[in-house]
Amino acid sequence: PSAPSPAIVRWDMVGDAPEGGDPIVSLPGVPSAASNIEIKRLYRVESSGVYQFVADLAPGVGQYVDSVQSDALGRALPSTEWDMPDARMIGLTALPNGILAGFFENTLCFSEAYLPHAWPVGYQLAFPDDIMAISSTSAGLVVVTEGQPHLVSGSSPDAMAQIELDVPQSCVASRSLVDMGEYALYASPDGLVAAAGRDARVATREVLSREQWQAMQPETIHAYRHDGQYLAFYDGGCFAFTPGEGIEFYDVQADAGYYDAIDDT
């Protein structure tokens, strides 16, 4: 089900019941946009404060006489807190256990497991700085920001924990963040930062000075994972980086890239 509509009728069962005791509920119309609505599901709340199932109705039904007795009400409404995703959200990323993640400004969002339309506000996490990009790795979700990076981990969207990684390196290019499997790489002011679990370091420090790195205009980098290498394009060329092996430069330009897992190209 979707998130519930606002309450559509209030009925004082003691002093304001209609004749015969059965209220007539006027239902909202179907939106004019193509919403692919199959049924309307009616719930009722009584003294317990919990909305319980009353009936399934066809989309075009405009009124319903509610004659269902209290002891015949069905299960509780599961979608009370299933908020729509924030319209500003970007960076949609799949996590294990059917969870999706996205972000806007300094806020990280999570969906309900296997319910990509449900994004409870109560699951959101705030960060000290605006988020630049996110990437799912085997150790958790790497969140790079305009300040320090963070690692977020958890098995369910309502129990995610965030820790700040001990490397004072912001992300200077959102498209530079790449999942490399057990770790992620991203472009910082001083070089490529490798974030592996709770550990993070500038991985290119031994092969490139800060001055050499800055001359490559790291804020223009967009990068991809290919054959275990970090393949990056920037305004001026291309390079492939492999931790422990070094960096190779190529005279190639590209505006975008895509990894085809079927052909491994």
Positions of PLM-derived features:
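Disordered, low-complexity "stalk" and linker segments at domain junctions of extracellular
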Residues: 1-106, 110, 116-122
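Beta-sheet-dominated scaffold domains
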Residues: 128-265
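Beta-strand initiation motifs
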Residues: 50-51, 72-77, 115-120, 157-162, ...
